[in-house]
Amino acid sequence: MQIDIVQIVGLGLIATFLSLIVKEQKPTFAFLIVVFAGCAIFLYLVDQIYDIIRMIEKIAINANVNMVYVETILKIIGIAYIAEFGAQLTKDAGQGAIASKIELAGKILILVMAVPILTVIIETILGLIPSMS
């Protein structure tokens, strides 16, 4: 399914317009419109995300890269996007403090997942440096 940016922007603008109209009478309902629009846009893009993941996996297989590293990097990217999405929704609800905690949790989880890759990179670099003894 081909996604057009005009459709995504249109959905976002319609949701924004509806949210602004409803916000005066029912602020909670206005927030739900925003959440629904955000989720709809994300779901609209799932096929493209899937295609990108498959393409990256094919490139990694052709380049003879260990799939554990590729999967870890894809998980890290997923954590970053999900944390950003959750933080933005929380900010939209006026809860900046909670949003910052979501962002912090995402950063910590990314760091935890990156440690094995960083370890391999450091070991590889150290293996390339001639020993001084």
Curated annotation (Swiss-Prot):
Database matches in InterPro entries: Spore_III_AC/AD, Spore_III_AD
GO biological process terms held by the UniProt record: sporulation resulting in formation of a cellular spore
Q: Give the highest taxon in the source lineage.
A: Bacteria
List membrane-spanning regions. 2-22, 29-49, 108-128
Q: What is its main location?
A: membrane
Query: What is the recorded membrane topology of this protein?
Result: Multi-pass membrane protein
Return the Pfam families for the record: SpoIIIAC
Say if the entry is tagged with keyword Transmembrane helix: yes
Intracellular or extracellular location(s):
Cell membrane
| GO CC terms of this entry | plasma membrane
Keyword Membrane among record annotations: yes
Q: Which UniProt keywords apply?
A: Cell membrane, Membrane, Sporulation, Transmembrane, Transmembrane helix
Annotated protein name in UniProt: Stage III sporulation protein AD
According to its UniProt entry, this protein's organism is Bacillus subtilis (strain 168)
Q: What is the lineage of its organism?
A: Bacteria, Bacillati, Bacillota, Bacilli, Bacillales
Q: Which gene carries the instructions for this protein?
A: spoIIIAD
